[in-house]
């Protein structure tokens, strides 16, 4: 598929969003919106946030349990109406009565409720990390609703092999940086900690501690990245979710949407190995590898990230 030169506004500071939305009666009015989702006998509030202008792109953040706002993409908001999901169990969204129900089926159900509420026949869908698991499942279950799919630093499979590889990569990271940053000795324990046994504050502390691992060169650009690190929030309950290991490898040829796979070259957890699996299995998928980038390309290389996404969405099918 051809790429087109795209001019991206280089202002990367996000504009503040109204809460509630400027026009709560319009589902795409800028700001915060709430949808009541029927879940068993309960109605659970699902929050989402609208920013920007242009074609609609729904974005599902990672975790599970990480606050949505790390995924703000102000450069994309210059070209797209971004609809950011605030996943159930986090922030101002509701809480499930049973924490074990924070699983892929639940996240997919709540995502579908938002897309239905938008009243659009189809949308572009972007999923980051765990949000990419949700996006893959949604594109398979609701193919008619997804015009374009952007799978960003994610994987088609988890389970023992996936986590063993992530731990091994984090161990290598710790060895490389142990002399200058002795605190990295605690990082593997943080990655493998039972966050569901902690408070939200404790889970947040773990996430902020291991954050440098998610960057290509955190300490070399610490003045840039430290403010974002300090605003990260982790909610403990979603880590209690139960369900089978995620694995859609055999289903990927059934994805009908145009698909872009984006991956940071140095992503330790959802790196090129997993991105290539998706790229090779999804018919016609494109692969973009962001140089000198870890798991957070929209923060580390925002111009390159935004250019890749906008070029993909503007290119003819």
Feature-to-residue mapping (PLM):
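Conserved HGGG/HGGXW glycine-rich cap/lid loop of the alpha/beta-hydrolase fold
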Residues: 39, 43-95, 100
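Active-site loop/oxyanion-hole signature of alpha/beta-hydrolase fold enzymes
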Residues: 84-126, 130, 307
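Short beta-strand/loop motif that positions the catalytic acidic residue
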Residues: 255, 261-263
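Alpha/beta-hydrolase
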Residues: 170, 183-250, 257
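Conserved hydrolase catalytic core segment
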Residues: 121-165
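Catalytic active-site module of serine/aspartate enzymes centered on a nucleophile-bearing elbow/loop
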Residues: 285-317
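Acidic catalytic loop of the alpha/beta-hydrolase fold
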Residues: 266-270
